Amino acid sequence: MKRIAIQGERGSFHDITAHQYFEGEQIEIICCATFEEVFENIKRDPTVVGICAIENTIAGSLLHNYELLRQSGTTVVGEHKLHIEHSICCLPEDDWSTLQEVHSHPVALMQCGKFLANHPDLKAVEAEDTAGSAAYIAQHKVRGWAAICSSYAAHMYGMKVLQENIHDNPHNYTRFLVVCNPQKAALLRPIEKANKASIVFSLAHDKGSLSKVLTILSFYDINLTKIQSLPNIGHEWEYLFYVDLTFDNLTRYRQSIDAITPLVKKIKVLGEYEEKE
């Protein structure tokens, strides 16, 4: 049985992702309060696999998680893209007329801004987790409170779904990374199926340095699907570039990494894995 560390409670979007990614397999979920705790679990027990959100089509990149990934020593072995759908739920004995507050993660509240604007009588309260909000209300039987979470979480905690699909934008997707101890990577993904990689590198303050790297990647038929820059702490005005690459030929991709290595100050391959639509 695989042990999967996630940020959040049972019923959270990380939990849904874990069950979808490992569909048909027996898994044990380890609920963590923070993303730091996810990586700490992998460090303590090399058999643990982690699920980590990295970007959302509306909220953007989770910048802190890029740094956690780089510093953790783990490797990326997969990705999963989840359609985020928000519902509002409450205790079975409550209804619209009895509700006073709605609790959820700040990002979920932001993504349901129009719905909340249409219900000015509901006080929006920030919480640490979407599913955790539903769990708290259910376990403490708090009358007058509602939670914004997935309908999956609502049903898990015996809550009543008042309305589904309350998010502003239907094109709301989160991309999650599956990470593990590097020595366990071969057991979780066949390298011959890899057609995507995540790398990070820094560059010297030379004119055209980034352009030269991109030109070489293009020569090897490597496609950039994302590039994210973050300050390199301790090195003024120097940046780390987190890049996602896709390719058709694993050998050509690895040749491209060899070719750009002399042009960068530091380079690290964060993972090689199969791209998901």
Residue ranges and their predicted role:
Residues 1-277:
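Domain-level signature for soluble enzymes in the chorismate/prephenate branch of the shikimate pathway
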